[in-house]
Amino acid sequence: MMGENSSAYTTLADNQLYNQFSPSRRKADLIASTSATSSPNLRKSPNRGFSSPRAQQKPITIFDQIVSWFHSEIDVRKKLASFVCGAAVALSFIVTVSILKLSIWAPFSSVQDSLTWWLYPTSWPVTLFIWLSSVAWTFLIIHQFCTVTQVPRIPITDTYAWAGAALEFVHRLIFVYTAFTVSESSFFEDFAWIAIAFSVAISSALVIFRSDFHLNFSNVQVNSFKTLIDFAKSLPYGSLAETSGVDAAIAYTAAMALTVFGSPLLWGFSAWWLLINIQFHLVLFGVCFAQQFFAKIFMKIVNQIVMKPMKFPFPPPYTVHSPTPDQIRTLPNVIETDDPLLKMFALHDLRTVAWEDEKRRVDVFSLSQPGKHPRNWKAVSMPCTRMLDELCSRMTVSAARLVGYSWDDHDVENEEVPRDALMMPRKMREMTYRGAGQSRQQKTIAPIRSNNTQTVGFLAKITRNLGLGKTERLVISRFDAQQNAYAAEAVYMLVVDSMGEDRFGVVQKDLKDLITLLCKLIAAIDTYERAKASVADKSDVTYLRLVDASLKSCLQRVVTTFGSHLRSLELADEHIRTIKLVCAEEI
């Protein structure tokens, strides 16, 4: 595993351990400490604290160096995404002005003007201004909201989200104002501009609070002009247009309500003439629809540029005493970092190795020299199995809490969660434990939910959808679900590949433990699903089911590959039953 290079992997704890087992080093430190405390100049006084640069500075580990390098790379990608999105906004500005210049009263001259206006040098400064302002806007939005741990919808109580909505409103208002000025539109007059500005404000809030700013890997990676065309073809234009139309209709309805009810007070009854102005309706809805549609395309572009997969090499089989920065950024080191985005890149790369990269799988199944230890396999498999084991523990605790089992009074070493209590409906469970004595009831029944989600009223549902209500606590978030799915698909696909590629048997030694962990996790998720159904809980389990589907697919592949060879592992009866239920075949 990593850590065989003492010069590169030394931290503060390693120094202390080295001092403990090194007599010469301990003696030198003892002499230095004695002289420091006996010197009058360095003696600590009650009014002055003793400090030294060595004591104040936190040691920089290789993980800090890797994270620092990764953040610099991501910052470059975010800047590139900002420039590309700014160019897309400038292009949409040209299209918007061209459409606004069209007129049914002068069809030929207006068509010629709409197609050639942007070719004149006098129009270039305006387009450049739109591009630069859009670059600044997209850069701030990407840095503030686009994260790998972002929730599907930002809560409406988030103050930073409101600041982002205000920034979006100012940016879009400048866009519309400049487009109307260049096209010499007549909508600056009367109440039309107020209605359009109000619709832009509503649409800007919808862009921030109803858009998903989650960073995720794209299915099609753009590496050439052909892949760019494939990426453009892969975009779900139908669903994007549908969701954009719904959000644009909300902003359009709000602007029309202001025109009907607010215009007599603000402008007079003459503003009602806008209600029969077809061009006004088309422009109003078109402005909102264009804003919503670009917000959807915006995240596609950001994910394509920022979330471009990275390849991390494996360390060589021999020990490198003075590794270069490139030799430090190995996959075993990267996968151990605490940065969420970097870990997601590492797990995605490990999954790519397991599924597609046969050349790099040779490094996974290789042995270190000297010693012949499966260093790479242990380094990449242990973080994944540790992650899956933590998920198994969380699912067990969550299932116990759903049925009212107090985990605080549970002896982990001598007891197990009563399975009959997990499968029993709530009313029958309460009747059973009510007559079993006060002590048993206190030990077993300790519900954590005071309200039933079936009794949620209509108003509470509306506030929850708007983000005002109390959000339901998920057992597993989208980020955790994606991480666990990548970890499972990577490790267990490597197990499948080891059947024909593992020449040294580095995976076969851990095969029983890996299959046992997989069966335990599938059973824990099934137990939670049954407990959730027994208490009529309405919490969202979409992400949990994605993990469950990945786990069952992994188990199916492992059983299909090894078949009858699994009998020699002597698995427990409960794990054999899980395999029969999931794979529907005997082993």
From Swiss-Prot:
- Topology, Cytoplasmic side: 1-79, 143-161, 209-255, 303-587
The UniProt transmembrane annotation reads 80-100, 122-142, 162-182, 188-208, 256-276, 282-302
InterPro entries xref list: Nucleoporin_prot_Ndc1/Nup
What is its membrane topology? Answer: Multi-pass membrane protein
Where is this protein chiefly located?
Answer: nucleus
Q: Which GO terms describe its cellular component?
A: nuclear membrane; nuclear pore transmembrane ring
Q: Does the keyword Transport apply?
A: yes
Query: Which residues lie within the region annotated Disordered?
Result: 32-55
UniProt keyword annotations, A-Z: Membrane, mRNA transport, Nuclear pore complex, Nucleus, Protein transport, Translocation, Transmembrane, Transmembrane helix, Transport
One BP term from GO: protein transport
Membrane-side (Perinuclear space) residue stretches: 101-121, 183-187, 277-281
Compartment(s) where it occurs, according to its Swiss-Prot or TrEMBL record: Nucleus, Nuclear pore complex; Nucleus membrane
Q: Which GO terms describe its molecular function?
A: protein-macromolecule adaptor activity
Q: Name the PANTHER family for this protein.
A: NUCLEOPORIN NDC1
Function field = Component of the nuclear pore complex (NPC), which plays a key role in de novo assembly and insertion of NPC in the nuclear envelope.
The similarity annotation says: Belongs to the NDC1 family.
What name does this protein carry?
A: Nucleoporin ndc-1
> Which organism's genome codes for this protein?
Caenorhabditis briggsae
